[in-house]
Amino acid sequence: MFIIELIKGIILGVVEGLTEFAPVSSTGHMILVDDMWLKSSEFLGSQSAFTFKIVIQLGSVFAAAWVFRERFLEILHIGKHKHVEGQNDQQRRSKPRRLNLLHVLVGMVPAGILGLLFDDFIEEHLFSVPTVMIGLFVGAIYMIIADKYSVKVKNPQTVDQINYFQAFVIGISQAVAMWPGFSRSGSTISTGVLMKLNHKAASDFTFIMAVPIMLAASGLSLLKHYQDIQIADIPFYILGFLAAFTVGLIAIKTFLHLINKIKLIPFAIYRIVLVIFIAILYFGFGIGKGI
């Protein structure tokens, strides 16, 4: 039985690593894979299972931090500066890197404030299968709209051409994504595209902006709930964290390599299919009714 539980921990870590930064909603996938199928709360207990999800989310966040480590060092004025994306040699000599710490802070403010105000309400009232399905579907439609608009934009901007207004608007959309299932990256990448960034630039800024917020939020949650971790469950937590970190590294790098080519519509279609599948399980078979 212990081996089976460890395998379940690895599976959940893999799912977290694949979905946390992809525009498909990690919350929706956790409901499907854990709450409807693996049910970690049955062998860990509800509080310990909640803490486990915090730990594997940290695995994904550390993966994103590693992928963007050079960017973060540059933003903090540590380390060597690379060429600015979207600028020629003359512009590079006359202009500093456009993306800086203030851009990130401006983008973080809306979600940070609303998170402090409404986090408990959202956790208590909005984490249910029907609300997550709504978030998945509405988010998919928003992504399709963004992709259709992006076709009309000539010479979309790179991440180093972003301005403070764009950063703030993208930050507001990150706050909207507090609705479970909407997807932080789906919302912010779509908004970035609507603000005339290219898909890769919108994705870069999304991940850079998300890392400090998620580190702070997950870190605070872990401080509140670390006492729920049982010594016997530590191998479960370690394997889940390592799985989320490793798979997260691969998923983030692959996503950033492909996003300018494939755009958002394939992810939107996948989300709609996922909604249909969850709806069949929930309304047709009653699976997840107690969530």
From Swiss-Prot:
It catalyses: di-trans,octa-cis-undecaprenyl diphosphate + H2O = di-trans,octa-cis-undecaprenyl phosphate + phosphate + H(+). Its EC number is 3.6.1.27. It is an enzyme of class 3 (hydrolase). Disulfide bonds: none annotated. GO terms for cellular component: plasma membrane. Bacitracin is thought to be involved in the inhibition of peptidoglycan synthesis by sequestering undecaprenyl diphosphate, thereby reducing the pool of lipid carrier available. HAMAP family: Undec_diphosphatase (MF_01006). This is Undecaprenyl-diphosphatase.
